[in-house]
Amino acid sequence: MRLLLIHARSFSFEVRDKAVENPEPLTEELKRGSADNTLVVFTTVEENDNDSPSFLERVADDVLDVAGKVKASSVFLYPYAHLSPNLAPPPKAITILNALYETLKGKASIPVYRAPFGWYKAFNISCLGHPLSELSRTITPQESAPQRKPYTRDYYVIVSPDGSIHDPASYSFSERDADLKVLVDKEVFKRELEGKEQPRYIDYCLKFGFEWEPLSDVGHMRYGPYATVMLELLDDYSYQVAKSLGIPVFKVKGTNMFRLSDKAISEHAGLFGERMYITESDEELVMRYAACFQQFAMIKDWVLSYRNLPLGMLEIADSYRYEQPGETVLCFRLRRFYMPDLHIFVKDLKEAMDVGLRLHAKIFEEIRRIGRDYVSLYNVSKEFFDQNKDYLVELARREGKPILVRVLEGAKYYWVLNVEYHIIDELKRPREIATFQFDIGNAQRFGIKYRDEGNNIKYPVIIHTAILGSIERFIFALLDTAAINEANGKVPALPTWITPVQVRVIPVSSGYNEGAIELARRIEEAGFRVEVDDRDETVGRKIRDAETLWVPYIVVFGEREAKTGSLSVRVRGVGQVSMSIEELLNRLNEETKGYPRKPLTAPMLLSIRPPLP
C-alpha cells in the first residue's frame, strides 16, 4: 500500500463522474466533503495488499502516529490510484479501503472522513508547508505479523453402502478395497507412492502426437494430426454424453479472458486462489480456469422460468491454470487444457440432489465403458453432511462400495458438495478425472435468476460437472488403461471409435496401389478413418509401423485380395482373420456404434506425407 500524507490547512472534494465501471456506491454524504487542519491520506491499494487485521492496524497506527505529531484535528482517507503501477482490482481495493476506514475510526480519538473509490473528483488542498506536512509511506503485508488462516477442522470418514460410518484410521480394508486404501493413504494420511520411473503412458502420448510446446509457457501442449482427431472426437462425444442426461443442454462458446474489475469475476477468482493466469492490456484480465465466467455472464441475461429448469449449458472451454512448473504433467496437469464444462441450473438443492444421482450414474457409466472404475472423494460442508447423510449413503450404495467423505467444518465455500472421481493409475496413484459439485453461491453473485410458480424471483442452484473430466485427462485415462493392460501381458489398444487410424491398407507392391486405394475409398465412404501405406518399404516394415500406431485393422492387399475380394486382415489383439469388405465394415460399425465419427486429419496416402515426429 502506498500513502502520501499531506497536513492541510484545508481540504475539500466533490464527485464528478465515474472512473471505473463498478465504482463504490455513492451515498449523499460521499458526494462531497471538507475539513480543516486535517491529515489527508492519499491511498493506493496494491495488488498484494489484503484486509488482514494485522496489516490494516499497522497502516492505521502509522497514519495516526503522523496525525498526532502534526496535531491534526481529523484524518481524511482519499483513494488515489497514481502512487503505484501495481493496482489492486477495484472490488478488492474497495474492500480494503473500507476496512482501513473502519480500523482508523476504531483506533482514532479524532474524526475520520473518507472519499469514495472509483469516481473522478475535484479537490482543493492547502498544504501547511512545515517539515512534517508532506510524507510518504510504502507498507506491505509482509511487514506485518504473519496472517493466520481461518481455523477449520476438516475430518474424514468412510461411509459404507449399508449406512455405517467409520474412522479411516481404524477401518479394516478388504482386498476389494485396495483402490479406496490408496485414496485414503493420499488424502487422509498424506502418503502417496511416487512413481520412480516414467509412466508408460507418456510414450503413448508422444506416439499419437500429444507433446509439450517448447516455444510457449510451461505446461502448454501441442497436438499433431492424430492427437487432433482424438480431441475433436471427444469434443463431440462430450456434448453427446451431456444430452443423454435427459435435460435440455445448450452448447455455447465465448471468450477466455475476463475483467478483474468486475465484482463478480473478482470474487469468483478469489475463491479459486493463486493458480490464476493474470494478463494485462488496458486493464487487468484473468484467463478463465473453466467455463464458469462465460456461461454465468451469458445466462444472467436469459429470462428464466421454473418451467425451463433444469437446464444445461456446455462449452468445451480452453482453460488456464497457473500450475507450478515442476508439477506439470503431460496430458494430465497442464496450464492450458480443454474442459467440457457442463453447468446445470436447477430450482433448489432438492432438485440438484435428484439430478446429481443421474450425473453420478453417467460418470460411472462412461469410465466403465473403457474398462476402469472410480474411487470417490466426497467433499461436503458440515451442514450438508449432518442433514443429508442418507444421500451420501445412497451414492455409496449406487457405487457398490465404501466411499471416502471429507467433512469441512468452520469454513465457508460456494459449494456444499464437491465430488472428485479418481482412477488409480499404473503407478498406484489416485488421479482425479471427473467431478461434480452443488454450487449455492454463484447464482446470486452473478445475478442469475428465475421466476418460480408464484412469480417470485429466485436464485437457482448450479451443478458444475465435467462428466468425462478434461479432454486431456480422459485421454490420459485411455492411455493409462492401455499401459495397465500391457503391464498385464495384454496388447495395448484404444477403443476403435477414438483410434486415430481405424484401418490401414498395405499393398504388397506398387502394382496393387490402385486396388488398395479403391478399397480404402469404400471404407472411407462408410465413415471410417483409413490410410494407405503406399511407401516404397517392405510389407514387414509397413505392418510394424501400423502396429506401432495401434491400428485395429491392418489389411494386406495383393493378388489374392484383388481377385477374390476376400481380405487378409490382421486384427489387433486377435491375429490374422479372413473376411470380406462387408464383414470388415460390419465389425467397424459394431465397434463404433453410439460414438461420433470424424474424418482423417491427414492425407490418406502415406507416400505424400513428410515423416511425422
Curated annotation (Swiss-Prot):
Names of required cofactors: Zn(2+)
Catalyzed chemical reaction(s): tRNA(Thr) + L-threonine + ATP = L-threonyl-tRNA(Thr) + AMP + diphosphate + H(+)
Region (Catalytic): 199-495, 200-495
CDD domains reported for this sequence: ThrRS_anticodon
Location of the protein in the cell: Cytoplasm
Pfam families: HGTP_anticodon (PF03129), tRNA-synt_2b (PF00587), tRNA-Thr_ED (PF08915)
EC id: 6.1.1.3
SUPFAM superfamilies the UniProt entry points to: Class II aaRS ABD-related, Class II aaRS and biotin synthetases
Any GO MF annotation of the entry: tRNA binding
Co-factor binding details: Binds 1 zinc ion per subunit.
InterPro entries cross-referenced by the UniProt entry: aa-tRNA-synt_IIb, aa-tRNA-synth_II, aa-tRNA-synth_II/BPL/LPL, Anticodon-bd, Anticodon-bd_dom_sf, DTD-like_sf, Thr-tRNA-ligase_IIa, Threonyl-tRNA_syn_edit_dom_arc
Region (Editing domain): 1-147
Gene Ontology biological-process entries: threonyl-tRNA aminoacylation
Gene Ontology CC: one annotated term: cytoplasm
Assigned keywords, A-Z: Aminoacyl-tRNA synthetase, ATP-binding, Cytoplasm, Ligase, Metal-binding, Nucleotide-binding, Protein biosynthesis, RNA-binding, tRNA-binding, Zinc
Superkingdom in the source lineage: Archaea
NCBIfam families on file: PRK03991.1
Assembly with partners or alone: Homodimer.
Function summary: Catalyzes the attachment of threonine to tRNA(Thr) in a two-step reaction: L-threonine is first activated by ATP to form Thr-AMP and then transferred to the acceptor end of tRNA(Thr). Also edits incorrectly charged L-seryl-tRNA(Thr).
Family: Belongs to the class-II aminoacyl-tRNA synthetase family.
UniProt note: domains: The N-terminal domain is an archaea-specific tRNA-editing domain that hydrolyzes incorrectly charged L-seryl-tRNA(Thr). Catalysis of tRNA editing is performed by the charged tRNA itself.
Protein's name in the database: Threonine--tRNA ligase
Organism: Caldivirga maquilingensis (strain ATCC 700844 / DSM 13496 / JCM 10307 / IC-167)
